[in-house]
A protein has these predicted regions:
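Residues that define the transmembrane beta-barrel architecture of outer-membrane proteins
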Residues: 56, 98-102, 147-153, 169, ...
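Residues on the lipid-exposed face of transmembrane beta-strands in outer-membrane beta-barrel proteins
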Residues: 49, 60, 64, 104-108, ...
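Outer membrane beta-barrel transmembrane domains
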Residues: 73-83, 236-341
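Structural signature of outer-membrane beta-barrel domains
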Residues: 65-71, 115-119, 123-127, 176-184, ...
Length: 341
């Protein structure tokens, strides 16, 4: 089998920064991309790209997150006889969506090159939709929906392809599987018009996501990036809602990428900056034996992360995402407490 990546010791230079210990005389040069000497710089970068767990070591990752989304839409239903003179109804919709979650993940290093990960979450969602119709007088209607419960359980495996010898980037292959344990959009109760009476806590579909990420040291930072393809598995719903017969539904697959860098200010504190983008393909739904497709989505977000090493076993991480495209959530914040054993 492939030899494990070379282990590299590290020392603190006069500026307080981590640097590899020089190799003994006659030994091959130490690979500058060795991840073990870069844990401080890598601690703040997004999950799924960061350094693998050490062989035989277990860690728990406790986290809480909050996501805020809002959308505004102005619709005119009528005719415009001359520019600026409209006959009909003006309808304005405003939707505010809040999602919070508590997550727990267990990570274990099978070898120095391979890590497995299992995670579960409890999700609470709340949507407030306000509709204003303007004809002779304004008519306002507000709808509040909520839902909470177990989310979709996920499992993943990551494998370090190379050791970063001769200054090359370290490449890591990953495979993630997402279950449908959460209550999906076709599992929740609906009224006689097919309108949901509460919110889903899961997608309702299984999915798999292969990915490749890289880590490339460029002193004093470490550059990171990833590409991924998330494939949903289609499902035959086979039920009638609001007078419409729902057949097979195939949620749109997603192509994702990210790029950024991590920087260690001292042995305890590091931060990261990055950008991630996903192109979500149209969802196809079979309604009354007619296949309809939704629009595709472009979801982009700026990322900012911070990490502080509390003790040898505990660290505190905070990650922010700010949406920069119309389809992206406005803001997402994740507070994580990794615990090493």
């Amino acid at each position: 089998g492939a030899a494990p990546p070379t282990q590299v010791a590290s020392q603190v230079n006069p500026n307080g920064q981590m640097q590899p210990t020089p190799a003994p005389s006659g030994a091959p040069p130490v690979a500058p991309a060795q991840m073990e000497a870069r844990r401080e710089q890598l601690a703040a970068i997004p999950e799924g790209i960061a350094v693998l767990s050490r062989a035989g070591k277990l860690s728990l990752d406790l986290s809480t997150e909050y996501t805020r989304s809002s959308a505004n839409r102005l619709v005119f239903r009528g005719i415009e006889i001359v520019p600026g003179v409209q006959i009909g109804v003006i309808e304005a919709n405003e939707a505010d969506r809040d999602t919070s979650a508590v997550n727990i993940a267990a990570k274990y290093g099978l070898t120095s090159r391979m890590e497995v990960d299992l995670r579960a979450s409890y999700i609470r969602r709340n949507d407030t939709i306000t509709t204003v119709q303007q004809r002779d007088e304004a008519v306002t209607r507000t709808i509040d929906l909520s839902g909470d419960g177990i989310g979709d359980v996920e499992a993943s495996v990551r494998y370090q392809i190379n050791g970063g010898e001769r200054g090359r980037p370290i490449f890591i292959a990953g495979l993630r599987a997402k279950s449908d344990t959460g209550e999906g959009p076709f599992d929740i109760p609906r009224d006689e018009f097919g309108v949901a009476t509460r919110l889903a806590t899961g997608s309702g579909f299984w999915g798999v996501e292969p990915s490749v990420s890289f880590l490339y040291p460029s002193d004093p930072a470490v550059i990171f990036g990833s590409v991924s393809y998330f494939a949903h598995l289609p499902r035959d719903i086979n039920k009638t809602e609001g007078g419409a017969r729902i057949g097979e539904v195939d949620p749109g697959d997603a192509i994702g990428m990210s790029i950024g860098f991590g920087f260690s200010l001292n042995p305890k504190f590091s931060f990261s900056l990055g950008y991630k983008h996903s192109y979500i393909r149209p969802t196809s739904s079979e309604l009354n034996d007619i296949v309809e497709k939704s629009d595709s989505l472009q979801v982009g977000a700026l990322q900012f992360g911070m990490s502080y090493l509390l003790t040898d076993r505990f660290s505190l991480n905070g990650n922010f995402e700010f949406g920069v495209t119309e389809d992206a959530p406005d803001m997402r914040f994740v507070l994580r407490l990794p615990i090493a054993f």
